[in-house]
Amino acid sequence: MSLVLDPAAQDLLFREARTANTFTDEPVTDEQVQAIYDLVKYGPTAFNQSPLRITLVRSPEARERLVAHMAEGNRPKTAAAPLVAILSADNEFHEELPELFPHFPAAKDAFFSERPVREGAATLNAALQAAYFIVGVRAAGLAAGPMTGLDFEGVRKEFLDDDHTPLMVVNIGRPGPDAWFPRSPRLAYDQVVTTV
């Protein structure tokens, strides 16, 4: 069975897409990032939650501060990438639910009045949105390098509001020389899918 999406687009988004470890110097513009967001904001979440927050690290001073919080192996590529984004979850996302989920505005108080519940929902749904963001970067013809090797608390204190939880840092740009490690294997269908 074939998929509806054109095979070239499937390759761009998944089969040929790789996590880049080196990048060219070509800038990533605000217009490109906005086009990516304007596409991926339509990805589904529970209750149409939109807890993902994206902090673009552009200035040399901010980049230096971020690199200090990255794991040693992630520092050179984070310093060299044309653009770096900190993806975080806004734990006060529920304040926007009356606007984003208008057919049930009471969802804000009915389901998310307790902080632990809110934090769990924010992390789960922002992680979904982060995955859409990575695919959106690929759809723009760019490479993404998502990383979780970092001092999360240090990044939160340095860059984020108190109510935001950092999820990952993503390097973004055109892949440079020797950008890829060898492709790692993936689990086969039968290892993942069961029928009951």
Swiss-Prot record:
Residue pairs linked by disulfide bridges in the UniProt entry: none
Is Translocase among this UniProt entry's keywords?
no
- Kindly name one Pfam family recorded for this protein: Nitroreductase
What SUPFAM superfamilies does this protein's entry cite?
FMN-dependent nitroreductase-like
Annotated InterPro entries: Nitroreductase, Nitroreductase-like, Nitroreductase_HadB/RutE, RutE-like
The answer to whether the entry has keyword Flavoprotein is yes
What is this enzyme's class at the first EC digit? oxidoreductase
According to its UniProt record, which cofactors does this protein need? FMN
User: What Enzyme Commission number(s) does the record list for this chain?
Assistant: 1.-.-.-
- Domain of life, per UniProt, equals Bacteria
Q: Supply the alphabetized keyword list.
A: Flavoprotein, FMN, NAD, NADP, Oxidoreductase
Alphabetized GO MF terms: oxidoreductase activity
As for family, the record states:
Belongs to the nitroreductase family. HadB/RutE subfamily.
Identify the PANTHER family for this entry. Answer: MALONIC SEMIALDEHYDE REDUCTASE RUTE-RELATED
> NCBIfam families per the record?
PRK05365.1
Question: What is the protein name given in its UniProt record?
Answer: Putative NADH dehydrogenase/NAD(P)H nitroreductase SCO5049
Q: Which organism is it from?
A: Streptomyces coelicolor (strain ATCC BAA-471 / A3(2) / M145)
Lineage, broadest ranks: Bacteria, Bacillati, Actinomycetota, Actinomycetes, Kitasatosporales
